[in-house]
Design a protein with these regions (language model features):
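Active-site hotspot residues in diverse enzymes, especially metal/ion-binding acidic/histidine motifs
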Residues: 1-188
Length: 188
C-alpha cells in the first residue's frame, strides 16, 4: 500500500522523499502553522476534517525541526490515505473539536489508527530497499574507517549507525531504528 502511494506521488524514487512537495503540490493540501499546538494539546499536527489541510505546530514547521516536520506530514498523509472514510462524517472546526472527535473513538481503534499512521510514515520516508542499501553502505564505511567490530546488536553501535542513515533520509535516528527492526536488520 505504501509502495503504491510512493510510486504514484513520488515516482522518481529519489531519497529523501520530499513529503512537503507531495502534500502541497501533488495533493494540493494547505500546510497551516498553528502556534503552540504541541504545548497546548500535545500534538505536532492533524488533518482537517474536510481533508484540505494539514495543521502543524508552528515551532515544528518554522524552527528547523526538520525531522519532526517531515514525519508529521507523512503521518497525516497516512491518515488521509488509509483512514479517509473516518473523515466522511467528521465535523470539527477547531483543535478542541478535533480532540473531541478522537476521544469519541474507542481507545483500541484510535491506537490502531495511530500505529498505522506511524508505520505508513516510516515506510514512506524510509523505503525498505533504500534502507537496506544505506545500512550496508554505513557498515562498509565503518569497516573502511577501521571500526571492524561493529555489532548492530549493540544498542550504541546501532544508534550511531541509525543517526548516520537517518541523515540520508532526513529522518531521526529513532525512525531508522524502528524501521530497521521492522525489516529485520536488528532486534527490536
Amino acid at each position: 500500500m505504501v509502495e503504491g502511494f510512493r510510486q504514484r506521488y513520488w515516482p522518481s524514487g529519489a531519497i529523501p522523499v520530499d513529503v512537503e512537495f507531495i502534500v502541497d503540490v501533488k495533493l494540493g493540501l494547505d500546510i497551516v502553522a498553528v502556534p503552540h499546538l504541541y504545548r497546548a494539546y500535545g500534538i505536532d499536527g492533524f488533518l482537517a476534517a474536510d481533508r484540505s489541510a494539514v495543521y502543524i505546530d508552528h515551532a515544528v514547521q518554522e524552527h528547523s525541526i526538520l525531522y519532526r516536520y517531515r514525519f508529521t506530514l507523512a503521518h497525516e498523509l497516512a491518515h488521509l490515505h488509509l483512514h479517509g472514510a473516518l473523515f466522511d462524517n467528521a465535523s470539527f472546526d477547531s483543535v478542541e473539536e478535533w480532540r473531541d472527535f478522537l476521544r469519541a473513538m474507542p481507545e483500541e481503534s484510535r491506537s490502531w489508527y495511530e500505529w498505522q499512521g506511524y508505520a505508513f510514515a516510516g515506510l514512506l520516508l524510509v523505503p525498505r530497499d533504500a534502507l537496506t542499501q544505506k545500512i550496508e553502505e554505513a557498515v562498509e564505511r565503518a569497516h573502511e574507517a577501521g571500526f571492524t567490530d561493529l555489532d548492530l546488536g549493540v544498542e550504541a553501535h546501532r544508534d550511531i549507525l541509525a543517526e548516520w542513515v537517518g541523515r540520508r533520509f532526513d529522518v531521526s535516528g529513532e525512525v531508522v531504528v524502528r524501521r530497521g527492526a521492522y525489516d529485520g536488520h536488528w532486534d527490536r
